[in-house]
């Protein structure tokens, strides 16, 4: 039985990855995340079905021990894009160091271990035309989140022989439990991906290791997940209403998480066949879960008016 390690396992994507791995019934699963009330609650229901380790991916001793004993690593542990305003040293300490620990441990102790690394499509910067993985990368001023992703990609390519890098756009998650990315320019035309499709693709990668090895792909939801960012934001505010996270992003965050469309995203869909959801199906699920937020929806109306005005320019 193949052994799979998931870092950042208590997040939205991590829990879905666990769900899909369990449904396959052929993997021994280890979930790694920091110990706190939130992660404990998220992973508690899996206690008897998987191995749960509470610890920090920044801990080299812990990572050495785990990497030695696993065939695949799905490395989801990362800071959130909204934290890109933090000092560079802090972001690097939190984000890059964990990836560096994993790469070093694979190199020294388990070179055959296959790393599945989710990067970001924000590495392309603000491009008007459809982009591909061969396009030149770009770092926005002070966006340390993106800078670390680019540096981690380079580290993986230089040091490892068994890996795949997925550049992932904004993930449409359950926003009652996970942050949405609010700092994207309203008129950016972009491809999204739903959390279910993204997690399923990460799991299906294991079955297609030889086909994707040492490659980089844009992992998106395709044409049915393509829209202007403002259209998606407007619908989220109409369904979910106003939130403190949205207000915080509006006040403090620079609009430096850019959206793109992709000329080559079909390549990975042809291998994994993971795309099953659309933006509209995501909205339908969101509506079913958020029927009670009447006051929040009322408070969101001025912001929706402003977004509509910007979209119709």
PLM-predicted stretches and their roles:
Residues 4-24:
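N-terminal Rossmann NAD(P)H-binding glycine-rich loop of SDR-like oxidoreductase domains
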Residues 48-97:
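NAD(P)H-binding glycine-rich loop region in Rossmannoid oxidoreductase-like domains
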Residues 79, 100-142:
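Conserved Rossmann-fold NAD(P)-dependent oxidoreductase catalytic core, especially the SDR/UDP-sugar
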Residues 93, 123, 128-165:
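Catalytic helix-loop patch of NAD(P)-dependent Rossmann-fold dehydrogenases
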Residues 124-125, 143-144, 164-183, 188:
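Flexible, glycine-rich beta-alpha linker
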Residues 279-313:
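Amphipathic terminal alpha-helices
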